């Protein structure tokens, strides 16, 4: 089991090495910006989709294009592009899922001209038939742009890729369930399991995760720690996860955009694969960047916390992330109504001092032990 966890850690910690490995094999890389992109299309057209969620880097050149109040995930993505960290990629796909993402694409065209920008425009009202048609039209634009880079599209290939991705989704949902029963898997290791998926082909990642599930299910769990549900856009900061482990907190479920939110919804496996993929987006819910008038995400967090016997909810708020800030008020009220302890910590990609986070989580730990 440790061998698998080490492989996943290496992939999560060394995305450039992963990228260079695929390039050395003659494969073409297409970067996928947060939060959701049609990876199945990219995969079906012969490219390797690779996540581009920024990194823990100082912002210098990105400030020439972005005001200070834009979220650091997107700003650091642009900074890495300018610095050459993504050199070798054939393109980047950036969705229109928040105000910051809507603006960064145009900046990317001028700041990183060596890596073509491919927009994917999603509708707010994604569930009606006209919303599905709009999503499909956006995907057709992506297909045309990828064809210019040498990719070829067919419904048959897309169906094959949908099956690959659905199997990976199932493995990730299953490992989430299994991890809830194994407190000995640390927050850092859990982060590696999910983060590594952005930097490996889905076939390779699925194979490792399925073996990990088998080994965990055959293993007796360790003594219980403090079970919590964690929520946010991104929770991969090593210092944050180290503090969670130090506080003996066990993540029994997550509502994290870069983790379980990616894998909740499968595309129907049908011959009209492009329509099916558009329907997948229509069927997605419970995310701050997806419009739902009644905000079912709030109930999902409370219900999941109860189902997994969590003692509390930790919201990790990415600084200047408007969609998450808007939802937090409703999440807080729902947790209070359910008598479910909740705390919030604010993070960004440039944080180097986590003393305030530590103090907050120490207090939260003491509260959960009462």
Predicted regions and their residues:
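Short, charged, surface-exposed secondary-structure boundary motifs
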Residues: 58-67, 126-131, 260-267, 353-355
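Redox- and metal-dependent alpha/beta enzyme cores, enriched for Fe-S-associated oxidoreductases
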Residues: 35-36, 40-53, 232-304
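Acidic/His-rich segments in extracytoplasmic proteins that coordinate ligands and/or metal ions
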Residues: 76-148
């Amino acid at each position: 089991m440790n061998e698998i966890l080490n492989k996943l850690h290496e992939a999560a910690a060394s995305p450039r090495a992963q990228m260079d490995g695929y390039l050395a094999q003659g494969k073409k890389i297409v970067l996928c910006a947060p939060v959701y992109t049609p990876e199945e299309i990219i995969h079906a057209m012969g490219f390797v989709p690779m996540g581009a969620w920024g990194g823990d880097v100082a912002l210098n050149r990105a400030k020439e294009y972005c005001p200070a109040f834009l979220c650091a995930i997107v700003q650091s993505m642009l900074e890495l592009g300018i610095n050459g960290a993504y050199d070798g990629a054939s393109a980047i796909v950036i969705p229109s899922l928040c105000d910051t993402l809507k603006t960064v694409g145009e900046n990317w065209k001028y700041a990183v001209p060596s890596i073509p920008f491919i927009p994917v425009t999603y509708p707010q009202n994604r569930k009606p038939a006209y919303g599905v048609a709009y999503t499909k039209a956006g995907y057709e634009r992506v297909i045309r742009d990828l064809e210019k880079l040498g990719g070829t599209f067919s419904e048959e290939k897309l169906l094959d890729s949908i099956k690959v991705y659905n199997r990976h989704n199932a493995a990730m949902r299953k490992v989430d369930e299994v991890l809830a029963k194994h407190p000995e898997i640390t927050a850092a290791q859990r982060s590696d399991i999910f983060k590594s998926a952005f930097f490996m082909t889905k076939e390779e990642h699925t194979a490792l995760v399925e073996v990990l599930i088998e080994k965990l299910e055959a293993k007796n769990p360790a003594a219980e720690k403090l079970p919590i549900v964690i929520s946010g856009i991104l929770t991969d900061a090593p210092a944050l996860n180290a503090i969670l482990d130090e506080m003996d907190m066990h993540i029994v479920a997550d509502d994290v955009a870069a983790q379980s939110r990616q894998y909740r919804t499968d595309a129907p496996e049908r011959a009209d694969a492009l329509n099916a993929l558009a329907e997948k987006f229509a069927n997605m819910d419970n995310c701050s960047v997806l419009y739902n008038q009644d905000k079912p995400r709030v109930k999902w967090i409370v219900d999941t916390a109860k189902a997994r016997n969590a003692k509390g909810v930790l919201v990790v708020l990415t600084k200047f992330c408007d969609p998450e800030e808007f939802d937090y008020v409703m999440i807080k009220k729902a947790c209070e109504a359910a008598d479910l302890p909740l705390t919030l910590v604010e993070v960004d990609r440039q944080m180097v001092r986590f003393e305030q986070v530590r103090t907050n989580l120490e207090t939260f730990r003491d509260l959960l032990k009462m």
